[in-house]
Structure formats: structure tokens, C-alpha cells
Amino acid sequence: MRAIICKDWGDPDTLELGELPEPALGPGQVRIRMRAAGVNFADCVLVRGQYQEKPDLPFAPGLEGAGEVMEVGDGVTDFKPGDRVMAVVSAGAYAEQAVCEATTVFHIPDGMDNMTAAAFPVAYGTSHLALVHRAKLKAGETLLVLGAGGGVGLTAIECGKALGATVIAAASTAEKLELARARGADHLINYAEEDLRGTLKKITDGQGVDVVYDPVGGALAQTAMRSL
């Protein structure tokens, strides 16, 4: 099958177009004919050999994608050949075919195209897991999103608003904050120009925030945590 191939650890510009064997299908897995694949920062880390998982070389990177189910392994009952799906893949979405666990495959809703679906699972899945399952964010609570202009930050804003929270978006430029405003953020903080903790006190009348969502882990992490 045709694939974008990582033959040695390095930057993304070292990837090559070539041929790889079709991946084997095991029990509980789904084979997908990939029509589109997402591009994430984690993909760059993966091909540099710095990710938490390190596939054997050579391999096709790509942690998420969308397409149609080709076949399913033993024990899979939620999907059948022809279903339109999006999926999180341990690696391999940058290929004509990918095999992944059925538990990381999702039906594509009617009206969503493959390009949109391919970029959905990682960013939105990260925010949904963090806010719904970990933080258990509730309606009426206040959510602070750091790095709010990035892909994961923007999805956190959308998830926060969908859950009924007041969302404070913090980013380093006016352009990024405009993106955050367009996604529904209630308050904006440019932490390159404003004191984050002081501005948070003003916005919350000194009460602080209920949840901090920090996809960056940078210098402002401690300041944000002290505002809880």
C-alpha cells in the first residue's frame, strides 16, 4: 500500500512517499481505508523518536484519520464494512489503510466531511476527556484555558461552552484571542501584555477559577494553578 514513511528518526521533512505492507488485522480491530488524516504536534514528536510510543522503523506516522471500514476483526460488532468512521490510530493514518482498535473508532455524523472528521478525534477527544471525565466541569463553573489559540485550546473553549461554563481564554497574541472569541470565549487575556493572576482576580471578583486547562505546561502553569 502507498504510505508516507518514516525510515529514520528526524524532522517531518525527512518523510518519504513509498510502499509498506498492509497491516495485519487482529481480534477487536478495524481496518480502515483512509481518505484523510489529521496533522498534530504529536506526529512531529513521533517521527523524531521522542513520543511516548516508539514504533519499529520503517512505519507510517499519523495518529488520527477518517475513511471507510474495509473489514473488522473477530469480536467487533459496532462496525461493518462501508461504515464511515474516524479513528485514533497508534500510528499509520498516513497510509492507504490503517488498522486500529475498535474502541478508538467512531462513526462520522451525517453532514461531517472526511477532512473535518480526520482532524476531530485527537484535539476534541483530549478536551472532552480532560473536561468531562477528569475535571468534571459543570454548568455555572469558570474555566481558564491557557494556550487558547492552539488547536487543543480552541476545542477546550467549545467543550467548556457546551457544558455551560464561563470560559476565560488566555493567549499570547491578539490574533489568537480573536480565534478564541470566535469559538465562544467569554473573557480574553493577553498574557504577553497583562498580568494573568491580577486579571483573573478582576474577572472573577477575586473568587478564582474552578478549572484550569493547560495544554502548554509552560511558565504560567503555576500562576494559573494559584488562581484556582
Model regions and ranges:
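Terminal peptide-recognition signature
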Residues: 3, 34, 98, 127, ...
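Glycine-rich beta-strand-centered segment in the early N-terminal region that forms part
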Residues: 21-39, 50-92
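NAD(P)H dinucleotide-binding glycine-rich loop of Rossmann-like/cofactor-binding domains
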Residues: 33, 45, 56, 84-147
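Cytochrome P450 core scaffold surrounding the K-helix E-X-X-R motif
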Residues: 42-48
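Short, well-ordered loop/turn sites that connect or cap secondary structure elements
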Residues: 79-80, 137, 228
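Mid-domain Rossmann-like dinucleotide-binding core that forms the NAD(H)/NADP(H) cofactor-binding site
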Residues: 119-194
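Glycine-rich cofactor phosphate-binding loops and adjacent beta1-alpha1 units
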Residues: 183, 187-228
